[in-house]
Amino acid sequence: MDKFRVQGPTKLQGEVTISGAKNAALPILFAALLAEEPVEIQNVPKLKDVDTSMKLLSQLGAKVERNGSVHIDARDVNVFCAPYDLVKTMRASIWALGPLVARFGQGQVSLPGGCTIGARPVDLHISGLEQLGATIKLEEGYVKASVDGRLKGAHIVMDKVSVGATVTIMCAATLAEGTTIIENAAREPEIVDTANFLITLGAKISGQGTDRIVIEGVERLGGGVYRVLPDRIETGTFLVAAAISRGKIICRNTQPDTLDAVLAKLRDAGADIEVGEDWISLDMHGKRPKAVNVRTAPHPAFPTDMQAQFTLLNLVAEGTGFITETVFENRFMHVPELSRMGAHAEIESNTVICHGVEKLSGAQVMATDLRASASLVLAGCIAEGTTVVDRIYHIDRGYERIEDKLRALGANIERVKGE
């Protein structure tokens, strides 16, 4: 397994170009299964999960090519099963189920893998599809969905806010007979992006970005060209990198209005922030950040995917900060690793109490999930001495060329190839 070796401390400053959003690209790739004409998807990040998704679409019979953009022609899809060997590494494969059953009347997906963060059940996906008229069976580790004729529109009230299930229901409902209303829908920018992609193909969707999405079913979806929105979590990660190293950064090709909660907390931490139409600049003027209190919650509140990075910020900040995680359980696995580097933190239930220290020291640490691993790499950039981050395949699932981008900002980081 590959590792990162990071030599610190360094001040991170300069410019970085943000990639397309993984959390929008994946649902959009699977939504392309609904299209009866070719689609072109631009600004798709080069990531492990994207490669796996493209491989899965190919196995289902779609023609998939990548030459800058990703081109998908799903006209000849003739396999309706997403097998375990591909699904085991990536939870997003559940998103194949809605499009398959909506367009072809059948689909089966192996129960998924991915990051090990607490309970991420597929129940909400299943109950949503059942309310649209699908018959669901769980057999031999597979979720099997089928319907006679078309799915039927329904009024669906989500038990809890779920990005994944909102995507599944919205995609399936585009080809259902009649109108579907999703109440308590997720409001994330990536949901809006997926809806806008479907609209490009001819879907009738309104209310995306609110907690009530209305989908009027259509007979078929055509093709089109669509550009994936920039990755707000990658943007936030690089802004934190500059903040903790007391540096200065400009993030280009980003979308500032998707990051309001994060920018507010960075300002609270003492950062000088300016935004343009597609750029954000952050300048710490050489100052140490101040500790902030953060509570994660569904969008538009503070994103859980920025929690680990702000935990790190608090651990090197002036003062004491509280970080409360309300979205996922078991999402503080980075804290013991950061403690090995000299951080001072206590975990009480779903809150981590961070007592800022002047400096961290390099150590051997292990990545446990995608965002936690990013925080360990950033910690290595500002720690004194050498940090080795193990199991970085987690990072490769969600960050495109992170070491190249950090190196361009002044980091001393190298990838050590595993056996």
From Swiss-Prot:
GO MF term set: UDP-N-acetylglucosamine 1-carboxyvinyltransferase activity
Entry's localization field: Cytoplasm
InterPro entries, alphabetized: Enolpyruvate_Tfrase_dom, Enolpyruvate_Tfrase_sf, MurA_subfamily, RNA3'P_cycl/enolpyr_Trfase_a/b, UDP_GlcNAc_COvinyl_MurA
Pfam families assigned: EPSP_synthase
Gene Ontology biological-process entries: cell division; cell wall organization; peptidoglycan biosynthetic process; regulation of cell shape; UDP-N-acetylgalactosamine biosynthetic process
Similarity comment: family membership: Belongs to the EPSP synthase family. MurA subfamily.
Function: Cell wall formation. Adds enolpyruvyl to UDP-N-acetylglucosamine.
Protein name: UDP-N-acetylglucosamine 1-carboxyvinyltransferase
Organism: Escherichia coli O157:H7
